[in-house]
Amino acid sequence: EPYDEGYHVADSVEATSTLCSRACQAGLKIFNLMSIEDVMTRDEGISGLVLNWSSVEMAGLHVDPLTVRARAVIDATGHDCEIVKVVERKIGPELNTPDGRIQGERSMWADVGEAALIENTREVYPNLYVAGMASNAVYGAPRMGPIFGGMLVSGRRVAEMIIEKLK
């Protein structure tokens, strides 16, 4: 519902469940309870992910992982920026950041964090993009708190960037 010029208030559960439902209706496949073990690399950069079931990891079982090839990978894992952490740990300080490393999320400052989120949505390593709170964690911006608008715009922006690159 409208709150002020350019601002809306929404029930968070209804809004996010509707987004998930509509995305699934459009063809999205959600792989629930999966963990990233590694990334796949080729000369041109990141080329996919190495995944396993979270329960396998938790139980310490020896189960071969699944590999998923991709021309572009998005780290939208939130504050933990899990995929970028794997790249930093395994490839080294080669990220598209001031010192090649994850800069670390700053303490909450909602309006500054929301503005930075859009700017920080970008390619952090060849074929690896960051969106949402992962982008602020990678580029050292403040966390945002309970604000969804920037997250949605970040998701749209990263999609547009990838579509343009893959043309």
What are these regions (language model features)?
Residues E1-K167:
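Residues forming the flavin
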